[in-house]
Swiss-Prot record:
<feature type="binding site">
    <location>
        <position position="337"/>
    </location>
    <ligand>
        <name>Zn(2+)</name>
    </ligand>
</feature>
<keyword id="KW-0808">Transferase</keyword>
<keyword id="KW-0819">tRNA processing</keyword>
<comment type="subunit">
    <text>Homodimer. Within each dimer, one monomer is responsible for RNA recognition and catalysis, while the other monomer binds to the replacement base PreQ1.</text>
</comment>
<comment type="function">
    <text>Catalyzes the base-exchange of a guanine (G) residue with the queuine precursor 7-aminomethyl-7-deazaguanine (PreQ1) at position 34 (anticodon wobble position) in tRNAs with GU(N) anticodons (tRNA-Asp, -Asn, -His and -Tyr). Catalysis occurs through a double-displacement mechanism. The nucleophile active site attacks the C1' of nucleotide 34 to detach the guanine base from the RNA, forming a covalent enzyme-RNA intermediate. The proton acceptor active site deprotonates the incoming PreQ1, allowing a nucleophilic attack on the C1' of the ribose to form the product.</text>
</comment>
<dbReference type="GO" id="GO:0005829">
    <property type="term" value="C:cytosol"/>
</dbReference>
<keyword id="KW-0479">Metal-binding</keyword>
<feature type="active site" description="Nucleophile">
    <location>
        <position position="267"/>
    </location>
</feature>
<dbReference type="InterPro" id="IPR004803">
    <property type="entry name" value="TGT"/>
</dbReference>
<dbReference type="GO" id="GO:0008479">
    <property type="term" value="F:tRNA-guanosine(34) queuine transglycosylase activity"/>
</dbReference>
<dbReference type="InterPro" id="IPR002616">
    <property type="entry name" value="tRNA_ribo_trans-like"/>
</dbReference>
<feature type="binding site">
    <location>
        <position position="217"/>
    </location>
    <ligand>
        <name>substrate</name>
    </ligand>
</feature>
<comment type="pathway">
    <text>tRNA modification; tRNA-queuosine biosynthesis.</text>
</comment>
<feature type="binding site">
    <location>
        <position position="305"/>
    </location>
    <ligand>
        <name>Zn(2+)</name>
    </ligand>
</feature>
<feature type="region of interest" description="RNA binding">
    <location>
        <begin position="248"/>
        <end position="254"/>
    </location>
</feature>
<keyword id="KW-0862">Zinc</keyword>
<feature type="active site" description="Proton acceptor">
    <location>
        <position position="92"/>
    </location>
</feature>
């Protein structure tokens, strides 16, 4: 039996306010999970992540398996001890990383053989191997091993990929249970941008039975309207009593639109990666600090922001100077700001859902950016 408990507390339209409870802590939803690919969120300490409001982080099964390897992580009792993070951790299965190595991989019914991006060695990964790795990592949420359907993909290609993922889902479930792992196991809905395939995938996953359901194969190049259409299609079909996780998404707008369509959990490298490239998120849009107009700008990234960078008074001019000099303090401060912004955005959405004012929140979110609020299904533009 899984250690995860999920409580759906209230809804506002399709937006959902809930709580995930694990032995290692609780996670208020909707939630954004900072990504710690190699066991650390780049440029920030674990205690700083917690102070920003994050309650769960994501680790990367694929990369941690290749380096440092399971022996080293096992010596620490798992990923929590290795990374010095005592809260819940979700680990992906390695499926997306295999997808990203298209030119180095060979997919068969058994699994995937690929060349390691580290040293070129041949490596095999299948559902059983992924479940074994995640058992050693001792994550709180384990993801099934699947094939991420590329975009664009014909319906036939997407169907064959989805059917393979379903067979792998069954093997993942059996391997996970066979290991006696009481961590939560999430299924992953595939099917590209084809509604019928998405329905078939979800039906197959529910027949197997999972603790939560992720929506995969999106944020891989498809237009935003197609992504939203898939979320709208799945919302009434997903079990209300299980958490829903939109993988690899995304921009602040994507989070708002995902929540509006019933998503509970998100992850993305965007806030940390963009910080390292001098792009800082604010309520009025993105500050691109390398722009010359910030050379003598005495404002903070966002006046009134409570992050360490803004509350300490670091100016845009100073951050631009650090960035131009390749000083490591620039991405550190930028990461603190961006993750604070993301976590506050999620907290504000949770509060709006609880208060029954999510529609107003969404309008204000776009108005602050000088943008028109996109209509939801059933609304006029």
């Amino acid at each position: 039996m899984s250690r995860l408990q999920f409580q759906l507390q209230t809804t506002d339209g399709h937006a959902r306010r809930g709580r995930l409870t694990f032995p290692r802590g609780t996670v208020e939803t909707p939630a954004f999970m900072p990504v710690g690919t190699y066991g650390s969120v780049k440029g920030i300490l674990p205690e700083q992540i917690r102070a920003l409001g994050a309650e769960i982080i994501l680790g990367n099964t694929f990369h941690l398996y290749l380096r440092p390897g399971l022996d080293v992580i096992g010596d620490h009792g798992g990923l929590h001890g290795f990374a010095r993070w005592d809260g819940p951790i979700l680990t992906d299965s390695g499926g997306f990383q295999v997808f990203s190595l298209a030119h180095r991989r060979k997919i068969t019914e058994q699994g995937v053989t690929f060349s390691s991006p580290n040293d070129g060695a041949r490596v095999f990964l299948g559902p059983e191997e992924s479940m074994q790795i995640q058992k050693v990592l001792d994550s709180d949420i384990v993801m099934i091993f699947d094939e991420c359907t590329p975009y664009p993909a014909t319906e036939d290609v997407a169907r064959r990929s989805m059917e393979l993922s379903l067979r792998w889902a069954q093997r993942s479930r059996q391997a996970h249970d066979g290991l006696g792992n009481d961590a939560a196991l999430f299924g992953i809905v595939q099917g590209g941008v084809h509604p019928d395939l998405r329905s078939r995938s979800l039906d197959g996953l529910q027949a197997i039975g999972f603790d939560g359901y992720a929506i995969g194969g999106l944020a891989v190049g498809e237009p935003e309207h197609e992504r939203n259409a898939m979320l709208e299609h799945l919302h009434p079909r997903l079990p209300a009593e299980r958490p829903r996780y939109l993988m690899g998404v995304g921009r602040p707008e994507d989070l708002v639109e995902g929540v509006a369509r019933g998503v509970d959990m998100f992850d993305c490298v965007m806030p940390t990666r963009n910080a390292r490239n001098g792009h800082y998120f604010t309520s009025f849009g993105t500050v691109r600090i390398r722009n010359a107009k910030y050379e003598r700008d005495l404002d903070t990234i966002e006046p009134g922001c409570g992050c360490h960078a803004c509350s300490s008074g670091y100016t845009r001019a100073y951050l631009r100077h650090l960035d131009r000099c390749n000083e490591m303090l620039a991405p550190m401060l930028g990461t603190l700001h961006n993750l604070w912004y993301y976590e506050k955005l999620m907290a504000d959405m949770r509060a709006a859902i609880a208060a029954g004012t999510f529609v107003e929140f969404r309008r204000s979110f776009y108005a602050a950016r000088g943008a028109t609020t996109p209509p939801l299904p059933g609304e006029s533009s």
